[in-house]
Structures are given as C-alpha cells and as structure tokens.
C-alpha cells in the first residue's frame, strides 16, 4: 500500500466567456495526490479523460463533496522536481470540452500537415531515428574494437618487420656459406681430375713395366736355350758368358726392382692421398647435407611465416570490406567525422595489406632462390658422388689387375724348369695396399626426398587467386 496525502479543490467559473474563446477554468475540481518516489522515472505527462456520471470517491477515506452532474473531469499525473508524484483533477463542461476537442483537432491537423511537409511520415522518422541510434551504438562498438585490433596489428607488423630483418641477415649468411661450399666443391673437382690424370699415368707406367718384364722373360728363355745348346760344346765359356749375362741380368732386375719399389711407394702414397681426399670429400658432403637440412628447416619456417602473413592479410581484407560496406551505407550529417575516421582506417588497412603483399612476395622470392640453390647443390653433390664412385671403381680395378699380375708371376716362377746353371729369378710385383672394404661402402646417397618446388607453386597459385 502506498501512503499518500490528498486535497480536493473546487472552482466555479465567474467571468463572462467571450465568443470564440473557451474558458479553461470554469467548474474545475482539483485533486492533488502526493506519492513518495519508488524509482527514478523520467518526467512524463499523461492526460486521461474520463466521463463520470457519479462523483469520484477518494481512496484515502476523506469525505468529498457532491460534484455537479454533467461535468467531465480530467486527471493529470505529473512529477515535480522534488521527485514527488502529483495527480490533479480538472473539470470541464461539455461545451467547453467540445470546443477544446475541436481546437485540438485543428491544431493536430495543422501539425500533421507541417510534420508531413517537414519530415514525412512520423512512424518512418521514428524508425529511422531508432535505426540511426542503433547504427551509432554499433559503430561506436566497432570503432573501439577496430582501435584495439589496429593496435594489435601494429605490434604484429613490428614483430614481422623484426623477423624479416632477421631472415634477411640469415639469408645473407646462407648465401656466403653457399659461395664457400661452391668454391670448395670446385677445388675438390680439380683435385679429383688431377688424381684421375695421375691414375692414368700410373696405369701407363704399369703397362710399360709389364711389357719390360715380358721382354726380360723372353730374353731369359732365349738365354736358357742358348746355354742348353752350348753346354756340350764349351761348358766353361758358356759358364763365363752365362755368369756375365746373369750378372747383367741380375743388375737389370735389381735396378728394375728398385724402380718398381719406388714406383710402388709412389703409387701407395697416391692411393693414400686418394683415400684421404675421398674421406675429406665425404666429410664435406656430410657438411653439405647438414647445410641442406638446415636450409630445409629455414624454408619450412619461411613457409609458416608466409602462411601467417596470408592469414593476416585475409583478416585485414575482411576488415577493409566491413569498413567499405559501412562507408557505402547512408550516413547523416552528424556522421561525417565517423566517415572520415573510416576512410583513414581503410586507407591504413590498404597500406598494411600492400605492405604485407610486398613482404609475402619478397619471402616467396627468397624461398624460390633458396630452393634453386638447394637443387643446384644437390646436383653438384650427386656429380661429386658419381666421380668418387668412379674413382673407387678404378682403384678396385687397379688392385685386381695388380693381383692378377702377381699371380701370373708366381705361376711363371713356379712352372719354370730348373737348369744346371744356378740362376735366381726375382719376381717383381706391384701390389697396392688393400683398401679397407668399409671405406668403399661408407658413401651413401643423400636421403633427402623433399622437393620444395611444389610449395613454391602452391604459394604462387594462392597469390594469383587472392
């Protein structure tokens, strides 16, 4: 229950009414109710007109006077600045009420005409005002979101710039290492070519020595035949001659043996140097493989960076489309500042999208260059591996030939018949040191099967589609 105080005041019209102007204060009955405020409510004025045949009864129990019949009462509810609700009851006669109603109708008709001329339909204006208020609230919220997002994007772009600088320095270091590797590979190629030439020269020398050995064996056989034929005629002369010939032959054999031992040592040194060069080439190939793996990892990092940049670019494009759609809508004169802010934000977004496109294009160029360098290095490494395998095959072939010559010499010395003349046959061999079998099997082909050209094609196709 609300506690209220009420007062009733009755007025009677005393003045004469002029024609054409209704009297507003005749037979007025005021009822004032003061109600304590429940909640702060905006000031509103509502007018209720009720037609009553009987006098009203107050709810607070006070005695009221009998009001005259045929009077229309109006109740007005208002609130004063002191946050108190008041109710005032006014009373009019029927003629006054009709005049008031006609006057109100005329005023409403004129106001409706003026409103239609100025603003058009009132309902449409209310809807437009509501829509504009909603758009303003949404635009303020979007502006706050865009400001925060733009700050985050600015920090992200700064981090991207720092990463781009680090990647540029890394690419410069990689280019330097690539130049060093290419120089080392060319030096190794020259060394292998020189080794191949020395191998060919040593093979020629070995063939010449083999021919000399065959000629010496033929001379030895001729001498034996002569000795056998001349033993019966003159044994002593033949012995002297055979001694002289044997001494000469022995000197020649010793000299040939010394030369052969020297050449054998030279060949052993050359083979050792070949093996060392092959080991160094294997080590360099392993280092090149490690550098290729590092480059693959860096290419993967660049790919991930490019994907993040493309996602960022897509988000910025979506924001730009939202700004453009918002700018393309109808805006009132009060939204010019908002329109200018949207234009500035869209221009900054376009600039950032252009900057991201340039960065993505630059990173794609770097990835393509690194991929081409990796492919060229792979081809060079494969060529070096083929050369090393060919050299190892030649070494094994030389070892087989040497073993075959040694076995032939052993066979000839064993099957040669002994004569009465005491002679010594010295077998001259040119055996090379057997190379360890593990060295020839240590060379393995590179296990990399990653070809980043497919990734470059995917990136280029994505860029053309966007």
From Swiss-Prot:
Keyword Cell membrane: yes
Biased composition (Basic and acidic residues): 45-55
Functional description taken from the UniProt entry: Plays a role in cellular signaling via Rho-related GTP-binding proteins and activation of transcription factor SRF. Targets TJP1 to cell junctions. In cortical neurons, may play a role in glutaminergic signal transduction through interaction with the NMDA receptor subunit GRIN1.
Coiled coil: 95-137, 187-415
Gene Ontology biological process terms in this record: intracellular signal transduction
Tissue specificity note: Detected in heart myocardium and lung.
Keywords, in A-Z order: Cell junction, Cell membrane, Coiled coil, Cytoplasm, Cytoskeleton, Membrane, Signal
Location(s) in or outside the cell: Cytoplasm, Cytoskeleton; Cell membrane; Cytoplasm, Myofibril, Sarcomere, I band; Cytoplasm, Myofibril, Sarcomere, Z line
Keyword Cell membrane: yes
Taxonomic source organism: Mus musculus
Segment forming the signal sequence: 1-16
One cellular component term from this protein's GO annotations in UniProt: Z disc
UniProt membrane topology term: Peripheral membrane protein
Name of the protein described by the UniProt record: Myocardial zonula adherens protein
